[in-house]
Design a protein with these regions (language model features):
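Accessory alpha-helical/coil subdomains and C-terminal extensions
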Residues: 3-5, 11-26, 30, 46-195
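Glycine/charged-rich beta-loop-alpha catalytic/anionic-binding loops adjacent to active sites
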Residues: 39-42, 72-73, 163, 203-208
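Short beta-strand elements at the ligand-binding edges of bilobed clamshell
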Residues: 40-53, 209-212
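A short acidic, glycine/proline-enriched capping/turn motif at secondary-structure boundaries
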Residues: 8-9, 36-37
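Short catalytic/ligand-gating loop segments at beta-alpha or beta-beta junctions
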Residues: 194-206
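Anion-recognition interface
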Residues: 33
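Residue-level detector of flexible, active-site-proximal loop/helix-junction positions
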Residues: 36, 111-112, 201-203
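Phosphate-moiety recognition in structured ligand-binding domains
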Residues: 205-234
């Protein structure tokens, strides 16, 4: 049994292995690493990340160009859960480095403070007349609570109550986080043009941004899993 994916896939493969043993089935389970989050232990990088990072970099490069003509504040929500690797890849889209977006980047490795966020957005907008922002879906407060959940409690919304089959809070399955941040900005800077997008599944499946190295490593990982399975070592 081969299961390709990240942490949840590894957990699922383990559950299947335990259940097979419990029922007396002869089954060997292999987890083949692949995750755009780039957060698996004992890895330098994960298959899937390179291609997704290219998509994010190109998306921000194009969005920054658009923002130069339709000036305002643009918030883009990027996947990654509790790892900021994919959001950090947004800066690879900067062309010259001078006033290129994203101008602000928010990762889950640091506590998200709404007050600081608004102050930084305002300062950037006043300096450049525009602002492009990269935000990880996993931003959270000092207690580790996802910001979307905090915002929902503050606003009386039910937007952050869903969890997946592994018990993980749904972070960017909808545009709720982007809308929440856009609303905060609109309240702090009334009259300002503010837009938000959630990249969603496109960033992990776009064929136009496949990394050659990523493609080769993914194939090698799958091949290694098959060799391990038929070798009888496991």
């Amino acid at each position: 049994f081969f299961y390709i994916g990240g942490n949840d896939a590894a957990e699922t493969a383990h559950i299947v292995s335990l259940e097979a043993a419990k029922q007396g089935w002869e089954m060997r389970c292999f987890h083949i690493p692949k995750t755009i989050d780039n957060d698996l232990k004992v890895t330098d990088h994960c298959p899937g990340y390179g291609s997704a990072a290219r998509f994010v970099a190109h998306a921000f490069q194009g969005d920054d160009r658009d923002n130069r003509s339709l000036r305002g504040i643009k918030v883009n929500i990027v996947m990654g859960r509790h790892a900021g690797w994919l959001t950090a890849a947004s800066v690879l889209g900067r062309r010259t480095g001078k006033d290129d977006g994203p101008h602000l980047v928010y990762l889950p490795e640091r506590v998200f403070e709404p007050t600081d966020f608004l102050a930084e957005v305002k300062a950037t907008y006043e300096r450049l007349g525009r602002c492009v922002i990269a935000v990880s879906e996993g931003i959270h407060d000092a207690d580790g609570k996802p910001f979307l959940q905090t915002y929902a409690e503050m606003s009386g919304s039910a937007m952050a109550g869903e969890v997946d089959s592994h018990g993980n809070v749904q972070l960017s399955g909808t545009g709720a986080l982007g809308d929440a941040l856009a609303n905060l900005i609109k309240e702090a800077l009334p009259g300002t043009r503010v837009r938000a997008d959630t990249f969603g599944y496109l960033q992990r499946s776009h064929p136009g941004d496949v990394s050659t190295v990523d493609q080769e490593e993914a194939r090698a990982a799958g091949r290694a899993a098959v060799v391990a399975a038929v070798s009888g070592q496991y």
